[in-house]
């Protein structure tokens, strides 16, 4: 099979939804890449999930830059908050990737599936925290950043599904919460990518063209296609019913999680 075509298709699919809904592609990329890698020769069954996590995180490194730039141009990034939360984010991604590297694929996959289902339910029910407080002090922001970074690294996401609700809860305007979350996604991706590269460095049995747990052939096709289609998704967001799209996206996530569960049971 021409796997590069499958990688391009995945990049287009995730980029389209990322542009329409402002959601990073990690939740779609990880389960799909896991299935793709498992179907190819040369990929050890015990490492396909780690390779999917690392490759997805590396892809987010590039896509988050484009998102950050766009939100900065619209003056939607609170750079003071980014500066306060980044040290905790970096510490958290280090913890998360080290933990992920030491956990076998099965419990890691179960954790990922639970997280995906929680996000899907949140999207279907459109649950949003009520603004009820101000941002915590430096120590509190560091602690929150550490938690966001660790969880984001464990499931290879840019952190938007965690950062935006937190900032909204702290009385940050939605536009600024989304823009700031996009900026926070960059240090998450840096720390997460380096962590997965380090954890998989010289790991025996990984396929050729792997840099740690990052599989370069998939990355090289995923990134351009997802970045190419994302602007179209953003334009479609103003023409299509966003609430319906979110429910469709959530249904796809649940189906992918179910497919991963079925794969673990056979």
Segments from the language model and where they lie:
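Membrane-embedded alpha-helical segments of transport systems
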Residues: 55-63, 91, 183-195
């Amino acid at each position: 099979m021409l796997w590069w075509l499958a990688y391009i298709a995945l990049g287009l699919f995730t980029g389209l939804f990322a542009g329409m809904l402002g959601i990073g592609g990690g939740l779609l990329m990880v389960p799909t890449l896991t299935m793709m890698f498992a179907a190819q020769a040369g990929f050890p069954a015990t490492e396909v999930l780690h390779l999917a996590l690392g490759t997805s995180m590396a892809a987010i490194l590039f896509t988050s830059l484009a998102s950050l730039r766009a939100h900065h141009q619209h003056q939607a990034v609170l750079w003071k908050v980014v500066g306060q939360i980044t040290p905790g984010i970096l510490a958290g991604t280090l913890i998360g990737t080290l933990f992920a590297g030491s956990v076998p694929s099965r419990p890691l996959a179960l954790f990922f599936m639970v997280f995906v289902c929680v996000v899907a339910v949140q999207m279907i029910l459109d649950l949003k925290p009520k603004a009820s407080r101000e941002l915590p002090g430096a120590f509190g922001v560091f602690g929150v950043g550490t938690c966001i970074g660790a969880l984001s690294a464990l499931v290879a996401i840019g952190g938007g599904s965690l950062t935006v609700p937190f900032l909204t809860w702290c009385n940050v305007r939605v536009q600024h919460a989304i823009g700031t979350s996009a900026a926070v996604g960059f240090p998450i991706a840096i720390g997460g990518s380096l962590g997965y590269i380090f954890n998989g460095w010289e790991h025996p049995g990984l396929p050729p063209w792997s840099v740690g747990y990052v599989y370069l052939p998939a990355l090289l096709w995923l990134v351009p296609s997802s970045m190419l289609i994302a602007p179209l998704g953003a334009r479609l967001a103003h023409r299509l019913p966003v609430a319906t799209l979110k429910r469709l996206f959530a249904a796809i996530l649940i189906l992918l999680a179910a497919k991963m569960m079925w794969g673990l049971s056979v």
